[in-house]
């Protein structure tokens, strides 16, 4: 149970006062004893009184001192030990070898302390210096030191090259049932060099593990065995050592259920810490500071410095917080650096919600975090999931190297220590929520390349793809090649061996050398490097950032080798990291930084230093598959932009060439420019062909087809000559002239946007027919059309024959009756339309039976159709019938202004299919359609109310009108007729049903329904009279039976027959 204990600073004051008072008391007692032995007896009461006076004199000082208490986890280690120390001081004040200082009593001095942070000198007595007289306790601005260090920080081996073994890429892990979270977390942890090196170093514990469980061994042993399996197996393995201990890791995790990878990571690290603490006998009595010195905490653990500043009195309260991962909010960030800026920025606390220690009241304050001690391996979790399970799927861009120096605390030791980290592994989540999806991992190998681990699948991945990954958990390890051997809060990152740091300079070695940013070859060319090592040692490398001349040391894997211990290389920031920080593209490398992965099998590749590999990447940027694909896409886009200079709308589809045998000459000007030029040369004609026989005989080329054809060959055809009609050249170079073809070409300017939509289907349909009809056409005309026939095209060709609609679209005007024909290339329903298309687009001058008859048919040949296809006039397209005002209009080749204007109208005879710029129906059009649908439904439901609102109206007699269908819902005359036949048969045949019963039924029916269906028409309405007449007719048996006599007449007839 937690107990309260006096703070060290106050306890020191109390101990000093007690020593001083007891020292005076002992001195007086010694004087009294000397009196007794030398000069006779004395009064014992006088000596006791003297001691009481002396104690009471110092009691005021003790009582006036301020005593502060803090919460401690254990009573025995805190209170009883302090009491024992006090008793020892009373009995043996001069000869005491035990320490009288409490935990952390020597925080403020600059002397070298022991392993537990105590000052063991001066026989345990603490002498106050002049500088410590005002500050006798520990400084609140410094991180407290633990009594005992379980695992020194210096023993952590950073980097793959610090291990004596050769690290492999690692095999995949088989998914044994929703264990992708477990596999990805283990792969990410096993590719952290510091953790992997520590697990390998636990071989002694693995052999002598005294923890006997049902599954055998502790969780650390299970992790070490799994790591060895991934390095030794040749195929995917099953992580059964970890999977079998899932309940031991976390009790609420269920086997076979999907779990969160970050939650599993936290429980796994905590289980490993507990397993390590169980090696010590009194692990339950260790304080929190000591427990934070385990290997897991030394690798992942760090300390945050929290500064809370009062806005009233500017008092600053400093606290320290231990962390193993940073949870970054990415809702307002797009990059990892922005997320770090938001995490370490100063935030304002709730107004009047903080109680200031200086003001002793609740005030407004600000809070800011900073890094007091940075971890060796930085774990970053991006907050992608909410409490309700939703996922934030935004992409956060990050770099393979980050610098956190600007977030370090403002102490001199921390400010001078550069904090450069490099990405070693990450966990990604694919899915839209935390309840579903898939986890994968990415890890960096010893060669410096990255691999993607998707359960049992392992494949290399380029650096560019790694940086574009939608990451969830990221692991960055401290980069020793970018750091200098400086102490961090008394703990050195190196092994105690000092070395001289070599500063980096940007200035060149010679006055004539200019600064060059980007890839640059070394002085010796490519031969100056051998497996990533520089051959020149005396001269500085001429790179973007050059280094001064330095003394050569035997190097292994980028770290200097001392007396059996690994040291950091004296390199400063590499050019690669500097270039990347400036925004330059990071070169994507393969397994060993080379294009071919076969070089990874060389014997000297494991001796490459990380810094030198970065130099090699900086000098020779290697292209990856992703970069090649991007280059190819860029080249394609450039070629397309060069070949197609014509600007197009976003809704215009991209056209492809109809056939491979068309000319490949580029188009020098756009189709629109050619059409404008042709319009200037063409005389104006009548807009509406009311009574012109000559214009009716002349075929008018379809402007939409001409536009679609010219668009489809935009990238492959040459400029049309003035004599060309449709802007196309023949297959063999022959040209076709049509002088009257541009009669209605001015309509294209009004329909340039809408006509482009039909070009895609037109070109696709022409592609299908080219191969089938090419041979047939070559037999007929061999690709040539004589000039005489082209002239006869405008004289003797019959007008197109549209299909017979159910109701012809006829418009009455003052000038007479005329039909409305439309140009619509997107209307085609079945295969019969193809035959009508052939009839409409004839090229051979065959006279039709009746040119004035719109329903006349003419024969056609496949060769004629092929010739029309070559000329670009007849292009088959998918057609959809458009219905306007109850009439169904079909496509025709006569293009005129009226048809184009009708198609563009929102109401009237045209369709309402107006598309937006994106090619989709407009929102306003959707609302109008929905409103019209609701209105029709409302009219259908409230037909009687609407008829009442309209009042009496004139009824139109129609021979085909069936009043009983709409006026009597639920009434079936055929059923009534059959019922009447059954009643008549039963009465005439002497059945069990008498006739009068049927008659009464009919009378009752008529009486009940007399006014039910005649509410608004009045008694003399035509509808009511028809209903009554129909009812009487059916009641009498229809047309086959006459009116039946009444019941009295039947009785009279029966009497007469009997008599």
UniProtKB/Swiss-Prot annotation:
Residues 766-776, 825-839 have a biased composition (Acidic residues). Residues 130-139, 528-539, 779-795, 842-862, 876-893 have a biased composition (Polar residues). Gene3D superfamilies: Cysteine proteinases. Residues 94-123, 540-560, 592-611, 633-647, 729-739, 752-765, 1048-1059 have a biased composition (Low complexity). The modification Phosphoserine is found at residues 508, 510, 692, 694, 766, 801, 807. Residues 655-664, 926-940 have a biased composition (Basic and acidic residues). It catalyses: Thiol-dependent hydrolysis of ester, thioester, amide, peptide and isopeptide bonds formed by the C-terminal Gly of ubiquitin (a 76-residue protein attached to proteins as an intracellular targeting signal). GO terms for cellular component: cytosol; nucleolus. InterPro entries: Papain-like_cys_pep_sf, Peptidase_C19, Peptidase_C19_UCH, USP_CS, USP_dom. Residues 171-479 form the USP domain. The keyword Phosphoprotein applies. It is found in: Nucleus, Nucleolus. Transmembrane segments: none annotated. The modification Phosphothreonine is found at residues 673, 682, 804, 846, 861. It holds the Pfam family UCH. GO terms for biological process: germ-line stem cell population maintenance; negative regulation of macroautophagy; protein deubiquitination; proteolysis; regulation of apoptotic process; somatic stem cell population maintenance. The active site is at 180 (nucleophile), 438 (proton acceptor). Required for maintaining multiple types of adult stem cells, including male and female germline, epithelial follicle cell and intestinal stem cells. May function as a transcriptional repressor by continually deubiquiting histone H2B at the promoters of genes critical for cellular differentiation, thereby preventing histone H3 'Lys-4' trimethylation (H3K4). Controls selective autophagy activation by ubiquitinated proteins. Interacts with atms/PAF1, but not with CycT. Belongs to the peptidase C19 family. This is Ubiquitin carboxyl-terminal hydrolase 36. The gene is Usp36.
């Amino acid at each position: 149970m937690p107990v309260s204990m006096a703070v060290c600073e106050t306890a020191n004051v109390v101990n000093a006062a007690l020593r001083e008072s007891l020292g005076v008391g002992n001195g007086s007692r010694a004087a009294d004893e000397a009196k007794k032995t030398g000069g006779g007896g004395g009064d014992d009461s006088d000596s006791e009184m003297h001691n009481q006076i002396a104690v009471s004199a110092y009691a005021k000082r003790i009582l006036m001192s301020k005593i502060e208490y803090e919460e401690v986890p254990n009573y025995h280690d805190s209170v009883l030990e302090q009491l024992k120390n006090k008793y020892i001081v009373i009995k043996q004040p001069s000869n005491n070898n035990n320490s009288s200082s409490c935990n952390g009593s020597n925080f403020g001095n600059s002397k070298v302390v022991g392993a537990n942070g105590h000052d063991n000198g001066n026989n345990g007595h603490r002498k106050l210096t002049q500088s410590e007289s005002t500050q006798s306790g520990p400084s609140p601005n410094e991180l407290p030191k633990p009594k005992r260090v379980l695992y020194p920080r210096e023993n952590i081996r950073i980097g793959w090259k610090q291990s004596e073994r050769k690290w492999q890429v690692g095999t995949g892990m088989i998914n044994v049932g929703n264990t992708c979270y477990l596999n990805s977390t283990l792969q990410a942890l096993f590719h952290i060099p510091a953790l992997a090196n520590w697990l390998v170093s636990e071989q002694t514990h693995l052999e002598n593990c005294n923890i006997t469980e049902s599954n055998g061994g502790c969780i650390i042993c299970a992790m070490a065995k799994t790591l060895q399996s991934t390095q030794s197996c040749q195929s995917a393995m099953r992580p059964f050592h970890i999977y079998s201990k899932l309940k031991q890791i976390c009790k609420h995790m269920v086997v076979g259920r999907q779990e969160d990878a970050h939650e599993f990571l936290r429980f796994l690290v905590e289980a490993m810490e507990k397993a390590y603490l169980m090696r010590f006998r009194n692990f339950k009595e260790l304080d929190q500071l000591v427990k934070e010195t385990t290997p897991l905490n030394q690798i992942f653990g760090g300390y945050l410095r929290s500064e809370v500043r009062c806005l009233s009195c500017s008092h600053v309260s400093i606290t320290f917080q231990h962390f193993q991962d940073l949870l970054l909010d990415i809702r307002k960030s797009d990059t990892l650096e922005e997320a770090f800026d938001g995490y370490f920025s100063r935030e304002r606390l709730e107004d009047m919600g903080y109680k200031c220690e200086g003001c002793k009241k609740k005030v407004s304050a600000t809070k800011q975090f900073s890094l007091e001690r940075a971890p060796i391996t930085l774990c970053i979790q991006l907050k992608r999931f909410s409490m309700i399970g939703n996922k934030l799927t935004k992409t956060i861009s990050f770099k393979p190297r980050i610098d956190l120096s600007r977030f370090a605390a403002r102490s001199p030791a921390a400010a001078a220590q550069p904090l450069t980290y490099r990405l070693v592994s990450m966990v990604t989540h694919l899915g839209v929520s935390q309840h579903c999806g898939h986890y994968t991992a990415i890890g960096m190998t010893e060669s410096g390349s990255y691999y993607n681990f998707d359960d049992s699948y392992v494949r290399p991945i380029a650096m560019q793809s790694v940086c574009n990954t939608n990451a969830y958990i990221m692991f960055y390890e401290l980069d020793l090649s970018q750091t200098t051997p400086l102490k961090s809060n008394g703990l050195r990152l190196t092994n105690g061996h000092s070395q001289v740091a070599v500063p980096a300079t940007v200035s060149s070695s010679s006055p004539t050398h200019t600064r060059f940013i980007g890839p640059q070859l070394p002085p010796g060319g490519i031969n100056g490097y051998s497996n990533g090592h520089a051959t020149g040692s005396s001269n500085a490398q001429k790179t973007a950032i050059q280094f001064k001349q330095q003394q050569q040391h035997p190097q292994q894997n980028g770290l200097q080798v001392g007396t059996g211990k690994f040291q950091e290389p004296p390199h400063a920031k590499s050019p690669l990291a500097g270039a990347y920080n400036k925004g330059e593209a990071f070169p994507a490398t393969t397994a060993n930084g080379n294009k071919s992965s076969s070089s990874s099998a060389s014997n000297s590749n494991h001796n490459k230093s990380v810094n030198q590999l970065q130099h090699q990447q900086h000098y020779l940027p290697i292209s990856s598959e992703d970069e090649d694909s991007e280059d190819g896409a860029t080249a394609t886009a450039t070629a397309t932009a060069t070949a197609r200079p014509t600007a197009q709308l976003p809704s215009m589809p991209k056209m492809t060439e109809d056939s491979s045998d068309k000319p490949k000459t580029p188009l020098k000007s756009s189709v629109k420019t050619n059409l404008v030029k042709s319009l200037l040369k063409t005389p104006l004609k009548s807009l509406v062909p009311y009574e012109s026989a000559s214009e009716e005989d002349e075929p008018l080329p379809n402007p939409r087809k001409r536009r679609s054809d010219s668009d489809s060959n935009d990238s492959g055809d040459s400029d049309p000559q003035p004599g060309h009609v449709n802007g196309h050249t023949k297959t063999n170079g022959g040209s076709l002239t049509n002088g009257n073809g541009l009669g209605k070409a001015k309509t294209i300017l009004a329909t340039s946007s809408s006509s482009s939509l039909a070009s895609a289907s037109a070109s696709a349909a022409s592609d299908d027919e080219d191969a089938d009809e090419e041979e047939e056409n070559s037999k007929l005309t061999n690709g040539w059309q004589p000039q005489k026939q082209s002239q006869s095209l405008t004289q003797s060709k019959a007008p197109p024959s549209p299909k017979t609609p159910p109701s012809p679209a006829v418009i009455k005007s003052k000038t007479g009756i005329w039909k409305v024909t439309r140009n619509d290339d997107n209307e085609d329903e079945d295969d019969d339309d193809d035959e009508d298309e052939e009839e409409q687009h004839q090229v051979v001058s065959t006279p039709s039976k009746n040119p004035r008859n719109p329903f006349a048919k003419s024969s056609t040949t496949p060769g004629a159709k092929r010739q029309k296809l070559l000329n670009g006039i007849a292009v088959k397209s998918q057609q959809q019938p458009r219905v306007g005002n109850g009439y169904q209009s079909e496509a025709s080749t006569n293009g005129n202004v009226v048809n184009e204007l009708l198609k563009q109208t929102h109401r009237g005879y045209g369709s309402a299919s107006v598309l937006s710029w994106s090619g989709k129906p407009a929102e306003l059009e959707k609302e109008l359609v929905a409103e019209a649908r609701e209105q029709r439904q409302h009219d259908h439901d409230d037909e009687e109310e609407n008829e009442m609102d309209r009042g009496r109206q004139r009824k139109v007699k129609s021979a085909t009108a069936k009043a009983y269908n709409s006026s009597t819902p639920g009434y079936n005359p055929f059923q009534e007729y059959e019922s009447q036949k059954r009643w008549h048969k039963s009465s005439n045949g002497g059945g069990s049903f008498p006739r009068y019963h049927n008659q009464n039924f009919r009378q009752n029916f008529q009486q009940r329904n007399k006014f039910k269906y005649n509410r608004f028409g009045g008694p003399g309405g035509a509808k009511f009279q028809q209903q009554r007449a129909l009812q009487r007719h059916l009641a009498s048996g229809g047309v086959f039976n006459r009116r039946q006599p009444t019941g009295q007449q039947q009785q009279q007839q029966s009497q007469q027959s009997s008599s």
